[in-house]
Every structure is written in C-alpha cells, then in structure tokens.
Amino acid sequence: MAIHYETKATNVGGRKGHVYTDDRALDIDIVSPAQADGKATNPEQLFAAGYASCFNGAFDLILKQNKVRDAHPEVTLTVRLEDDSDSESPKLSVSIDATIKNVISQEEAEKYLQMAHEFCPYSKATQGNINVDLNVNVVD
C-alpha cells in the first residue's frame, strides 16, 4: 500500500497544553472548549478545520470529475461534543453543511455530496464511528 502523505503532531499537556507539527507549520496552545478564550484552540476546532478542508477538496474534485464548473463549493463543518449513553466519556458528532452556486439541481448536488462523503479520507476514517449529517444548499 502506497503512502501518499504523512505528517506528525506532538502534544504536551493534553487539553491544557501545546501542540505542534514536525515542520512547525502548526504551533499552538490547546485548551478545553469550556476554557476557550480566542487565543488558543481545542481538538474539536482542529478536527473541524481538517475535516472541512478535506471534505471540500473531495467535493470540489467530485464536481469537476462530473463536469460541474463554477460551483464554488463552500463547506462548514460543525463538530459537537455530546453525551454518550454507552459511556461516561463524551462522543463526537458532525454536521457537514455545503453550499454551491446554482449550476446544478438540488438532487444532483445531493448526489455529488454523497459521492464526496464516500471519497473523503476523513469520512472514511469516521465511518461507523460518529454520526454525520450531510446537507447541501444550492444558491444563486
């Protein structure tokens, strides 16, 4: 199996600590969501940013492969930390909300969004592990 990319991140101090990547492109303080002050981030924000970016790349690729031009997809990913009835620790759930320009029908947009979900590496990694809601809006 060929590896397409590999990166490393190191955390010191957990949710009240610091995280950095091996190339220091990311080098930031970490806090728990309850202590967010705008000067540090938390694991849920980092997950949302990574998943949104990866998913939008997949969505844009699927649109282009299907000859949909000028759709200008935008993806907002909401990560929720919620109670888990099966465990004392919380669990994650996400909503993927995409918006594209009115160059295809709502039905086509939903089909391509589902295809992107099946293609996206983050979606593959979370499949069967977290609840994911998919939504797409076609706008003027």
UniProtKB/Swiss-Prot annotation:
A GO BP entry: response to oxidative stress
Pfam families: OsmC
Top-rank lineage group of the source organism: Bacteria
Membrane-crossing residue ranges in chain numbering: none
Record family assignment: Belongs to the OsmC/Ohr family.
Protein name per its UniProtKB record: Organic hydroperoxide resistance protein-like
Organism: Staphylococcus aureus (strain MSSA476)
